Design a protein with these regions (language model features):
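C-terminal helicase lobe
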Residues: 149-162, 176-211, 217-409
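SF2 helicase catalytic motif II
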Residues: 47-92
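Conserved phosphate-coupling serine/threonine residues in phosphotransfer and NTP-handling enzymes
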Residues: 39, 97-99
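Catalytic P-loop NTPase motifs of RecA-like helicase/translocase cores
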Residues: 43-44, 66-75, 102-103, 216, ...
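Interdomain hinge/linker at the junction between the two RecA-like core domains of SF2 helicases
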Residues: 84-87, 92, 99-147
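Loop/turn-to-beta-strand initiation segments
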Residues: 32-35, 55-58, 89-94, 151, ...
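Conserved nucleic-acid-binding Ia/Ib motif block in the N-terminal RecA-like helicase ATPase lobe
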Residues: 1-38, 117-118, 179-183
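Conserved helix/coil segment N-terminal to the catalytic DExD/H
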Residues: 16-58, 66-69
């Protein structure tokens, strides 16, 4: 889109081939590449290469509220952007988000070199809440809604649920089956792009998705957003609801979640920050594997670690294993790095010998995970009992800090 204006924009992500990466970095150095679209994870990992080009003068951080949500392992690269940007010579930074309360804004200010704030409190009066919280037969309600054929996004709280609900709807509403798809972070980037394009063009009319769908996606004619299950916090609630009616025409946000969802979300949060006994078993397993290769790094993916620990009688998920790796690394109990072969990365682990006694609560990652549970508790207590008028007001407006805006001339 920018080529007619003489601007060369390229994309770099973890899925970019080595040759493509070399070409883009070479283009940055010689001036033939003007803009690089990338992810925080790629930027943090490749900060030295970006810095070496000596041409980075402007950095845009979209969906900057993730800086405030980077606790408990939620895209932690966002929290590292400040030091990464400093490595590149402190270029001008523009941070953008529609969901930034005072706490999140403070986090953004702390991490990024932000000099001022521009706040837009515009209300989206075309959005209307359909309150069906705690509905006993929400599956029937959803099937009836899908049968109407309007472009709709249905949000659920896990990847597995996105696949299961899409299959269920295809069976219950067979006339719509070819038009029902699913979207989650487990799909490859190419698959996600393909599904998004099918939904944009109308080849898919109903999309069952996790929160992975939405941010950065501007599809104007979504008439229905369905919160089938309970979101995890207020920012996620607003981000999901805000996908509806971006063309300015009337759109509806259907609230189908209820108290029965609380236990499901609690379990997922528990998996992401498991208790002491689970993490102790994960650490014992790592030490056992280390004894097979004394002093050397060994390959250990989250899923494989979860399988081994579960096989020993302590059932855990890959999310719990990932938490253990992150916490142990922070506490200085292990070292990790990624080894690449044929373009594929593998996580390598080495358990440090002679590490002293540590407490889990010495880990910021662990404490933040516990904090996520508190945030969820406060959110569900509010959203379950809040009256519909207040919920519609929340859906219609952005989450902004209560501060004096910077007036530009």
């Amino acid at each position: 889109a920018l080529a007619p204006f003489g601007i060369n924009a390229c994309t770099l992500t973890g899925e970019s081939a080595p040759d493509e990466r070399r070409q883009v970095f070479a283009g940055l150095r010689d001036g033939s590449v003007d803009i690089v679209l990338t992810t925080p994870e790629f930027l943090v990992c490749h900060a030295p290469e970006f810095a070496a080009t000596d041409r980075i003068g402007f950095v845009v951080v979209d969906e900057a509220h993730h800086i405030g949500l980077s606790r408990a392992g939620h895209r932690p690269a966002y929290a590292q952007l400040g030091s990464t940007i400093a490595q590149m010579g402190n270029p001008v930074v523009l941070a953008l988000t529609a969901t930034s309360d005072e706490a999140v804004t403070s986090d953004i200010d702390r991490v990024l070199p932000v000099a001022g704030h521009v706040v837009d409190d515009t209300m989206r009066t075309n959005l209307h809440v359909v309150d069906q919280r705690n509905l006993r037969n929400r599956g029937d309600y959803l099937a009836t809604l899908v049968a109407q054929g309007e472009k709709s996004v249905i949000y659920v709280s896990s990847r597995e649920q996105s696949v299961a609900l899409a299959r269920n709807l295809r069976k219950r509403v067979p006339q719509m089956a070819p038009l029902i798809g699913f979207y989650n972070a487990g799909l490859s980037r190419a698959e996600r792009t393909r599904v998004e394009e099918l939904f944009r063009t109308g080849a898919i009319a109903v999309l069952v998705a996790t929160s992975a769908f939405g941010e950065g996606v501007d599809i104007p004619d979504i008439r229905n957003v369905v919160l089938f299950q309970l979101p995890y916090n207020e920012i996620e609630f607003n981000q999901m609801s805000g996908r509806a009616g971006r063309d300015g025409k009337d759109a509806r946000v259907h609230l189908l979640f209820g108290r029965s969802d609380v236990k499901h979300n609690d379990r997922i949060l528990q998996d992401m920050t498991p208790d002491h006994d689970v993490l102790a078993e994960v650490y014992r397993t790592l030490r056992t594997w280390q004894r097979k290769t004394p002093g050397e790094f060994f390959e250990m993916a989250d899923g494989e670690l979860a399988r081994i620990v579960s096989g020993a009688g302590c059932e855990i998920t890959a999310a719990s294993a990932a938490c253990g790796i992150a916490v142990f690394r922070e506490l200085g109990l292990i070292e990790t790095h990624v080894a690449y072969a044929s373009g594929e990365g593998a996580r390598m682990v080495r358990v440090k010998e002679g590490a002293g006694r540590v407490e889990l609560t010495d880990s910021v990652r662990y404490r933040e995970g516990l904090g996520e549970r508190d945030i969820f508790k406060a959110f569900y207590e509010w959203v379950i009992d809040c009256d519909c008028a207040r919920l519609e007001q929340r859906v219609s407006g952005p989450i902004t800090p209560q501060m004096k805006p910077l007036h530009l001339r």
